[in-house]
A protein has these predicted regions:
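Hydrophobic, regular-secondary-structure patches
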Residues: 30-106, 443-511
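Short helix-loop junctions at transmembrane helix boundaries
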Residues: 48, 252, 323-360, 646-653, ...
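A cross-kingdom feature of multi-pass membrane systems that activates on extracytoplasmic/periplasmic
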Residues: 201-202, 210-258, 620-651
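Feature of multi-pass inner-membrane transport and sensor proteins
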Residues: 1-26, 285-302, 329-359, 367-452, ...
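Short beta-strand boundary microenvironments
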Residues: 96-152, 164-175, 192, 199, ...
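Interfacial "coupling" helices/loops that link adjacent transmembrane helices in transporter permeases
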Residues: 20, 271-315, 668-710
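Selective transmembrane-helix segments that form parts of the transport pathway or gating/packing helices
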Residues: 307-324, 397-403, 704-718
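N-terminal membrane-entry
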Residues: 250-267, 356, 647-664
């Protein structure tokens, strides 16, 4: 065969595509959807990374590591390192806001830093670094003082002295300052040292390091440790920024990387299965066409190349369309999140183009189509010239003995199962498509659970406002809780007592953190129990208590804790609590038990939940009441904005995940509908013969339903079996190890999966059956 003839065969590709436009429509749609899915997922991930990078730079600063406990000489050498872009010393006073530093009447934290701090924290708006006697102040100071650049503000020191500082600029990141109803003053190190010396306040100096772009962050950190003998304990990482650069050595972040890689891989596999199955079905129903080409003299290699290039010809329109659809959907989702969800999405790019998403989507389409066409191409090349006369070759559809025994006299059911299982590859592709969709559903359902555990403001006990005495001692009068509860704006007010106690447990001695709960807090804690029960009345001189799961806390139900003159028994374990984890086990008891053990009956902290978190007047009223009652010796925390942002993030996350799962479910349904439709088209003559020899409409429906049902059942069995294993592993990795909650079979998810699969079967059967029944039997017979 000459090269000229080969070219003439390949010239049939655009002609065939034009003639078979309707038949190829579903295959092209599958490619479009697969490319769209991957493009949208990776583009959205890229946009989210850009947003989080911007947010973290503004909130936590543009630094990679912070080093402490080093000499000035070592600090100077670090600043001169080739891979270091920005280096700044940093010291603070009253970061805990427990000392009496006031700017006006608001508590103040003081920061002393080098000029380079402006490069570390982009939110600081100042043309030049503060000079002696000047400060950068958090912008929330403008809420109660008429302050502009150049205005002098008074700073009251703990010894009662007042000094005047000039405002040189503002720090627009006020989230932490607003939460604690305070301001942060940033000054140069000379001014800072003078103030510290004046009040005889000691401080520690730390050093922020920002590495140059395209630096191997992990290697640079290791080099610093080795060269200067700095231990890991002296180096703190900016975890979020390092994670966004895929450079974090945090075990939990590394686990999230692995989870993301697995889920991304399954998304890609879902697209591969869909494209491969569609091309395989398309080629199967055109066997007679390839047989005709063999009659005209085409060789096997020519037919093989024809099939591959024909598949790539579909990509000419399908890949750009899929990428465009993915980009537009990303724009729409970003615009929705930015406009309607919350301020935390304000830095999300609305019309951003993601090269990563486009490259991944295009590569998936082209590479998958090329390799997916390989097997059908070999199959088409095997078509003998006689196929052109006998029609499309269909795998042996004869009923196997096992099918006959299974369905007895129901020959149509046996035939349907045989049609599904006669092509092992097609069965594998359909089963894989179903199974992957189920795997994705069960995997992403774990992420939804993880968000609920990870975000504390979503919990029932999350306060809107909190107040604690500056010393952190139990000095808040319980009467104050009653006064707050009596306010019409307050939904709940509740307090907690706290006391560290020496104890002996599990054969070792060590401190415990004893904390009290009232009735309403125990009610909330009930749903967080992962073992045991809530504490009841003391028995035999033993006080029942709860503990909180933590990897460093080995206490479990039944353990006893011996105090100096009392014994506690752990009767329950919680997976979560409002408290930050410490090296000491958290032990929770009733207020009465706390009083009997410590003799104290006042609170260390009072939390407040409001009926309307948007009522600024109510918040101001409560703030005034607390400040007047406690003579301003309190740390007042306003968590409303932070809670609102996290709740918005929670719902946005759910929205994105559910939208993704809906797309996956839709693609799965489309895939089986397409495959059943193509299978019916390939066997159209066979169905005509069956109708001619007496098969009625009901039997025909049952036969095609049996074929679709076989795909569904095999997909359900494989998908649920593998999905439950993966669901359990992800749950243990993300939740059990960190929150203590035990894995349980997700019956709700399984029920949804079964319903979706049954819906796919019903939709897959409807159109092919209607098409067959509309075709006259004589039309089929006349073609034989």
């Amino acid at each position: 065969m000459s090269s000229t003839e080969m070219k003439s065969y390949l010239s049939l590709i655009p002609i065939s595509a034009k003639v078979r436009r309707r038949q190829n429509r579903m295959t092209i749609l599958c490619i479009v959807l697969a490319v769209f899915l991957v493009t949208a997922v990776f583009s959205m991930a890229d946009m989210a990374i850009r947003m989080e990078t911007s947010n973290q730079l503004n909130k936590n600063g543009n630094w990679h590591i912070m080093v402490k406990d080093i000499s000035p000489e070592t600090a100077a050498e670090l600043a001169a390192q080739e891979d270091v872009a920005v280096f700044s010393a940093y010291s603070d006073i009253n970061a805990s806001l427990t000392e009496n530093y006031f700017a006006g009447d608001k508590r103040a934290a003081l920061v002393g830093a080098d000029d380079a701090i402006l490069q570390i924290f982009p939110g600081m708006q100042c043309s030049t670094a503060p000079a002696d006697g000047e400060v950068l102040v958090t912008a929330n100071i403008r809420d109660w003082l008429d302050v502009t650049v150049g205005t002098a503000i008074p700073l009251t020191l703990p010894d009662g002295q007042t000094i005047s500082l000039t405002v040189a600029g503002f720090n627009e990141d006020t989230s932490d300052a607003n939460q604690y109803d305070a301001v942060v003053l940033v000054m140069n190190r000379s001014t800072f040292s003078q103030i510290a010396a004046q009040v005889e306040e000691s401080f520690e100096t730390q050093y922020f390091i920002q590495f140059k772009p395209r630096t191997n962050l992990r290697q640079s950190i290791v080099n610093i440790e080795n060269k200067y003998g700095i231990s890991e304990e002296k180096i703190s990482e900016n975890t979020y920024l390092m994670a966004l650069n895929a450079s974090s050595n945090n075990d939990y972040i590394a686990g999230l990387y692995a989870v993301a890689a697995v889920l991304a891989g399954m998304v890609v596999l879902a697209g591969i299965f869909m494209i491969t199955g569609s091309i395989n079905s398309n080629v199967a129903q055109r066997t007679s066409y390839y047989g005709m080409l063999r009659c005209l003299g085409a060789g096997k290699n020519q037919v093989r190349m024809l099939v591959r290039l024909e598949a790539l010809f579909w990509c000419k329109t399908a890949v750009p369309a899929g990428c465009l659809l993915g980009i537009v959907s990303t724009w729409g989702l970003c615009s929705f999140l930015r406009r309607f969800i919350g301020e935390e999405f304000s830095s999300l790019p609305v019309l951003g183009i993601s090269p990563v998403g486009i490259i991944c989507g295009s590569a998936l389409g082209l590479i998958t189509v090329w390799f997916a066409a390989s097997s059908p191409a070999r199959r088409a090349a095997k078509a003998s010239p006689i196929t052109a006369a006998t029609g499309n070759a269909v795998e042996n559809a004869a009923d196997s003995p096992c099918h006959a025994r299974l369905f007895g006299s129901r020959a149509e059911l046996s035939l349907g199962v045989s049609h599904a299982t006669s092509s092992k590859k097609n069965l594998l592709l359909m089963t894989g498509s179903f199974a992957l969709s189920i795997l994705l559903f069960l995997s992403f359902s774990v992420l939804l659970r993880w968000v609920g555990f990870a975000l504390n403001p979503l919990q029932s006990y999350a306060p809107d406002l909190s107040v604690a005495e500056t010393s952190g001692q139990n000095v808040l009068d319980p009467v104050l809780v009653e006064q707050l509860e009596a306010l019409p704006e307050v939904k709940h007010a509740f307090g907690r007592m706290y006391c560290p106690l020496p104890a002996e447990y599990q054969g070792k001695q060590g401190p415990i953190d004893l904390i009290s709960y009232d009735t309403i807090q125990f009610g909330w804690a009930k749903k967080d129990l992962i073992g045991g029960t809530l504490p009841q009345e003391p028995e035999d001189g033993t006080y029942p208590v709860l503990t909180v799961f933590d990897k460093s806390n080995s206490l479990t139900v039944g353990d006893t804790i011996q105090l100096e003159d009392a014994k506690l028994t752990v009767v329950g374990v919680l997976n979560d609590s409002p408290f930050s984890s410490t090296d000491s086990p958290i032990v929770i008891c009733t207020e009465e038990t706390f009083h009997q053990l410590t003799g104290q009956n006042r609170y260390a902290v009072i939390d407040i939940q409001l009926k309307d978190t948007t009522a600024d007047a109510a918040i101001a009223k409560i703030h005034t009441l607390l400040s007047d009652t406690l003579n301003k010796q309190v740390v007042f925390s306003n968590r409303i904005e932070g809670n609102r942002m996290i709740q918005s993030t929670y719902w946005a996350f759910h929205l994105v995940v559910y939208a993704f799962l809906i797309v996956i479910a839709g693609i799965t349904i489309l895939n089986i509908v397409n495959s059943i439709s193509m299978s019916v088209s390939a066997r159209m003559k066979q169905y005509g013969i069956l109708r001619a020899i007496g098969m009625d409409d009901a039997q025909l429906k049952r036969m095609i339903s049996a074929e679709a049902g076989t795909y569904a059942v095999s997909g359900l069995v494989v998908g649920i079996a593998l999905g439950l294993v993966l669901n359990r592993k992800l749950y243990i990795l993300l939740i059990t190890h960190y929150f203590g909650a035990a894995w349980q079979v997700p019956w709700g998810c399984l029920a949804v999966i079964v319903v979706v699969v049954l819906a796919a079967v019903v939709l897959a059967v409807y159109n092919p059956v209607r098409r067959i029944l509309m075709q006259p039997i004589t039309a089929t017979i006349s073609e034989l």
